[in-house]
Amino acid sequence: MESIGVLLTCPMNPYLEQELDKRFKLFRFWDFPSANDLFREHSNSIRAVVGNSFIGADAQMIEALPKMEIVSSFSVGLDKIDLVRCKEKGIRVTNTPDVLTEDVADLALALILATLRRICESDRYVRSGSWKKGDFKLTTKFTGKSVGIIGLGRIGSAIAKRAEGFSCPISYHSRTEKPGTNYKYYPSVVELASNCQILVVACALTPETRHIINREVINALGPKGVVINIGRGLHVDEPELVSALVEGRLGGAGLDVFENEPNVPEELLAMDNVVLLPHVGSGTVETRKDMADLVLGNLEAHFLNKPLLTPVV
């Protein structure tokens, strides 16, 4: 397979890059002055693309690479891949589900706890020497709080299971009601927000879920409510979130993703009731290796004419 051209769209993981280089003829997108230079020189050599949640395979890339057979994404989310165009051209698409579910669910709970118990602010309080001047203020408990989850898929279900361990009543919103669950279902996000204290975004990004957290939803959640986003930045209308936090219409937020990463609204940086993370939901050594192995396994399966491990298209 050493002669098969594979395009890596951006730096992702050292192990993945090393293994791609060993097993295939690797092209690194960032080694070229522009996309046009890459396409002009190697359009007929590239048969596979490895993308992620930042750079995938858009219509321009798909059209520019006529020999492309498969896109293997180093992510679960596929919003950076033109799936319609891939289907039209018979290009296979894979992702990395399941292997990152536990890490992302763990992080969601960590964000909830950090936001409610002001863990980051408490840490700064000790480091700054403020503790010597007096005790830290009281915070809010998590146990028993009602948790609403948008998207009860693999990750949403794992979050619900963890929250149950804190005696939290669970409710959810999904495209359809899930059979076999005892959680309360709400057909609209506004209804869900009106009936929970912590609202967690765990759904896929689609045109329908873009800005699913908007002014109406935030107002329904209320001034004591907390938004947790471990989905995609575009799930949240960021200007509306910022204004709600500034005006006290929302109690707090724990955010792992943002609309225009790595840029974060300036106003959020000074807020102690907001916890900000640099999109690290799956960011553990173990999980990133598992994700890389899944990408590699899908590529090898495709080029050996074997069934794909995690086919999407």
From Swiss-Prot:
Activity at various pH: Optimum pH is 7.5.
Gene Ontology CC terms, in alphabetical order: cytosol
Entry keyword annotation includes NAD: yes
Enzyme class: oxidoreductase
The protein's assembly and partners: Forms homodimers.
UniProt function note: Involved in the biosynthesis of L-tartarate from L-ascorbate. Catalyzes the NAD(P)H-dependent reduction of 2-dehydro-L-idonate (2-keto-L-gulonate) to L-idonate. Can also reduce hydroxypyruvate to glycerate, glyoxylate to glycolate and pyruvate to D-lactate. Prefers NADPH to NADH as proton donor.
Protein name listed in UniProt: Glyoxylate/hydroxypyruvate/pyruvate reductase 2KGR
Organism of provenance: Vitis vinifera (Grape)
